[in-house]
Amino acid sequence: MENNLENLTIGVFAKAAGVNVETIRFYQRKGLLLEPDKPYGSIRRYGEADVTRVRFVKSAQRLGFSLDEIAELLRLEDGTHCEEASSLAEHKLKDVREKMADLARMEAVLSELVCACHARRGNVSCPLIASLQGGASLAGSAMP
């Protein structure tokens, strides 16, 4: 299949791109993928460039780019706008680092709460539940 990616029906195209047909239609509605002309009395056909474009979208999504950001990257895809693409990637990297810092804070708080749960004795209420109910400030410190 890899060696002949021209003149594909939407089902074969979706399979070649590693997505389902509804994803193809969704990308078309969002303007991420052009809908090919439909010859009179026939069906639309897709080619290798379409497969490449969908793979681009999926790769960008795996890196955390939103569909709007991907649309902007696609606008720059001729390769001559490296500075603009780099700027978008730097912004995404900043977002990822902020999320990682938030996750590290959440991990620290949850770890502390789990330890507190294991250390509790007797009829003392659960520190995790108490924290989530506002009885302690630990849970609040996990979120920015």
Swiss-Prot record:
Gene3D superfamilies: 1.10.1660.10. It holds the Pfam family MerR. Changing residue 117 to A: Decrease in transcriptional activation. Residues 10-29 bind DNA. Changing residue 126 to S: Abolishes transcriptional activation; loss of Hg binding. GO terms for molecular function: DNA binding; DNA-binding transcription factor activity; mercury ion binding. GO terms for biological process: response to mercury ion. Residues 7-76 form the HTH merR-type domain. This is Mercuric resistance operon regulatory protein. It comes from Pseudomonas aeruginosa. The gene is merR.
